[in-house]
Amino acid sequence: MKSWKVKEIVIMSVISIVFAVVYLLFTHFGNVLAGMFGPIAYEPIYGIWFIVSVIAAYMIRKPGAALVSEIIAALVECLLGNPSGPMVIVIGIVQGLGAEAVFLATRWKAYSLPVLMLAGMGSSVASFIYDLFVSGYAAYSPGYLLIMLVIRLISGALLAGLLGKAVSDSLAYTGVLNGMALGKELKKKRKRASEHASL
């Protein structure tokens, strides 16, 4: 993180803290749903727990953004009283690594919507493998597991990838991300649009 700007670190930290609160709220909501419909009820909302990794990576576009943001969010969640306790930090690392692996595959150079959705799906796969070995998912039938995985993949793509991009773009339009990678990209797009309009 030596090449990171102070503004990048501050904004990433603030966003991670905000989403830590969101994560905790969804944890309680998910527990209610699971109590009513079983563990599969978590899957449609699972992608929300990956969103900060996509937002941070998309805004900053530097190695480690996806992973570090998830770790910060998990640490704050732990302090706020997540039912999983310190294990939520391990979960955050797993989820962050899943997203980071996708950006690594592009050498941190591609941040299109498909890549962001794949990052959400990467977290889905990583977290699902974790759940198989740690959360007792291995006890479920193969068919049930397949349905859970498919739903989680879709949730990761939509709630982390698509929604994460929408949130980031909205922040960029406010000007708060000026000087950061996404803010610079938006500035260039506006300049090109202005030049095109003047022709």
Curated annotation (Swiss-Prot):
Location(s), subcellular: Cell membrane
Membrane topology: Multi-pass membrane protein
Annotated coiled-coil segments of the chain: none
UniProt GO cellular component terms: plasma membrane
Signal peptide: none
Transmembrane segments: 9-29, 40-60, 63-83, 85-105, 114-134, 143-163
Alphabetized UniProt keyword annotations: Cell membrane, Membrane, Transmembrane, Transmembrane helix, Transport
UniProt key word Membrane: yes
One of the Pfam families matching this protein, by short name: ABC_cobalt
Function description: Part of the ABC transporter complex YkoCDEF that could transport hydroxymethylpyrimidine (HMP) and/or thiamine. Could also transport other HMP-containing products. Probably responsible for the translocation of the substrate across the membrane.
Subunit structure comment from the entry: The complex is composed of two ATP-binding proteins (YkoD), two transmembrane proteins (YkoC and YkoE) and a solute-binding protein (YkoF).
Identification of the protein by name: Putative HMP/thiamine permease protein YkoE
Organism (species): Bacillus subtilis (strain 168)
Lineage: Bacteria, Bacillati, Bacillota, Bacilli, Bacillales
